[in-house]
Amino acid sequence: MATRWQDGLEMVRRCDQAGVQLFVVKQNRRNATLQLLKRAIQRGRFGRIYMATINVFWSRPQSYYDGAAWRGTWEFDGGALMNQASHYVDLVDWLVGPVESVQAYVATLARNIQVEDTATVGVRWRSGALGSINVTMLTYPKNLEGSITIIGEKGTAKVGGVAVNQIQHWEFADSDPDDEEVRSASYETTSVYGFGHPLYYENVVKVLRGAAHAETDGREGLRSLELLIASYISARDGRRVALPLEY
């Protein structure tokens, strides 16, 4: 929704003042694979969650960045975390819960750009769970993986593929009717964008007609933006950064 924390806050404030809706696209939440994972968490099937890891191993050659002047810039794009991995960073809070703190490292290892092409973020959730976000745009020779793995007291699951489109591991101490949907929830895709956008826009239309509440509004967008900004502050200053940020 923004590349700067204060810009995101200002967007929410001004929309509130004007009495208009602010919608933020979070299409990955609509994936059938992640809907199953979300329900498993909500139903307590994991028990206590111990660890969660997100991997975004994609490829963006120099020609991609050279193709448009805004790409690879701090002002208009952001780096691998802010741009390509932002929808995966969104899963950190949406699935596992509020984050206590982050410790991040970012680097520009191969591309001629202002921003990072590679990053890793250590995460501690308020629940005590630990995990990481690992991102690179340098995967050879093409996009390899967009995944989330959750390890808990009573269950382990991995949703992977190139764009969280395949349930690759699904094992719990108990059984649930959702277990029968695991195979059908997975799908093949050649696009990292998935197929969640139509369902997102369906919610937007319903909201504008007064038939629903916005599922991903401006305040929801701030949750992942806050985590992103905290990660950049951590990498810049070489320290652990606690959340929430100062408003």
Language-model features: locations:
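C-terminal helix-rich "cap/oligomerization" subdomain common to oxidoreductases
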Residues: 12, 17, 126, 205-247
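Short, mixed charged/polar active-site loops
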Residues: 130, 156, 184-188, 213, ...
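Predominantly a Rossmann-like dinucleotide-binding segment in NAD(P)-dependent oxidoreductases
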Residues: 21, 28-113, 238
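Alpha-helical elements of Rossmann-like donor-binding domains used by nucleotide-donor carbohydrate transfer enzymes
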Residues: 10, 36-39, 91, 120, ...
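Short polybasic amphipathic segments
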Residues: 148, 164-180
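Active-site loop of classical SDR/Rossmann-like NAD(P)-dependent oxidoreductases
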Residues: 189-201
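Contiguous beta-strand/loop segments that form the cofactor/metal-binding neighborhood of enzyme cores
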Residues: 89-166, 198-211, 246-247
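Beta-strand-loop-alpha-helix segment that lines the small-molecule cofactor/substrate pocket
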Residues: 1-29, 44
